[in-house]
Amino acid sequence: MSLVPDFSRRGFIRLAVAAPLLGQIAAKNAFATAATALGKNPRQNVYTRLGVRTVINCRGTWTYLSGSLEFPEVTAAQRQASEYFVNMFELQHAASRRLAELTGSEAGMVTSGAAGAMASATAACMAGGDPKNVWQLPDTTGLKDEVIMMGGRSAFDNAIRLTGAKLVLAETPEELASAINNSTAMIYTTHLGNALVSENIVAKKFNIPILLDDAAGIPPIDNLKLYAKMGLDLYTFSGGKGLRGPQCSGLLLGRKDLIEAAMKNTSPWEGSVCRAMKVGKEEIVGLLTAVETWLKTDLNALNREWNARVQRIEKLVQTVPGVETDISIPADGNRYPTLHISWDEKKWGYTVKDCVQQLRVGDPVIEVAGADNPSIVPAVHEGNPKRSSQEEPERRNLELVSSTIQPNEVLIVGQRIRELLNAARKAAPGA
């Protein structure tokens, strides 16, 4: 019988597995020290010169963390687009035709993010393309002006309300059918799967346009074509998240008549309610290029690469006794290999929130998904206020989203989390 406890044997094995990574960390630290001694700072850039710290982003494509990093092809296309003048009406329609070719939808347009698509779509469903109605918004007198929100309020529904629309809340297909009346202009949903199919059936029955907001729905890129095949009237994606296009861009796809109306309710039309949501020639060309690039990309190969990044971090943090980890891909959006890290918070006297904050204030700044959302207006209450519901439980693990972690950041992240967890474990009462 072995005299070495099982726990210690597991710890030894984990250390052995992580040994090559720990060696790389030591070499990397030595190189950084030497570079500093020579007066060179490898992290200096346009942001640090402004006094703004760059971030190692393990949280994903959040807007407050500047979304995603563009495909190199997108950056190159934007630079070329910036060198010419062009008629924006002509460019919008050319982009619409190209998006139709790429996605199978009848038409499409580039918007100022998915929220801009929500506003343009709502205006289109209320005012159509009639110039008098376009100029009238956000005054909705005499127009259909109710939008049924499936699932309740959202932090983003002001994109709908600013057009003058009124919100009506519904949760089930039955409630949706009951809520439809002569003032209903549009149905808004974020639901996927069977729920979306059921809602689309109701929308078709009553001839009411439905808008699907799937801002974080790419990857997979197949969703561009899936919703067209489902016959959705309108659907939107963020351009600055998984699509890796310009941060301030979005895609609105769907019926040609509604896309044409959406174009007439936004920039460059002067007097349109969405005029402020301007997108330039660079965003239009850049997002088209992002779609084209994605359609040539091997998602399986990307997933293997992303998975390898978080696996290396996992090996490092697993050397801390008492830490549990797993890697999975979410099914409802932000579909990237994601590392979950947990420990006995009560026993250690160290919470997920504590760890998130220490990572955030460190050097370098590391952002992970934890127990907070620093970018939400504190007064926001999502869902249906008429329903009695409990607060969402506080997150009990760290989440690291692989797609925004850069290859040269993997060891930095793994070692920093390992250091924090080791220190917390050793400082725990009774340790």
Role assignments for model-derived ranges:
Residues F71-G113, A124:
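Conserved N-terminal alpha-helix of the aminotransferase class I/II PLP-enzyme fold
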Residues T61-L69, R79-E90, A301, T404:
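A short N-terminal beta->alpha junction/helix N-cap motif
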Residues M88-H93, A107-G108, C274-K278, T297-W306, ...:
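Flexible, glycine/charged-enriched surface loops at secondary-structure junctions
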Residues G11-A16, P20, L38-I56, G60-S68, ...:
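Conserved PLP-enzyme active-site core in the AAT-like
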Residues Q318-R425, P429:
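Conserved C-terminal alpha-helix-loop-beta "cap" of PLP-dependent enzymes
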Residues V55-Y64, T75-S82, T338-H340:
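Generic N-terminal amphipathic, Lys/Arg-enriched alpha-helix
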Residues M1-A34:
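N-terminal export signals
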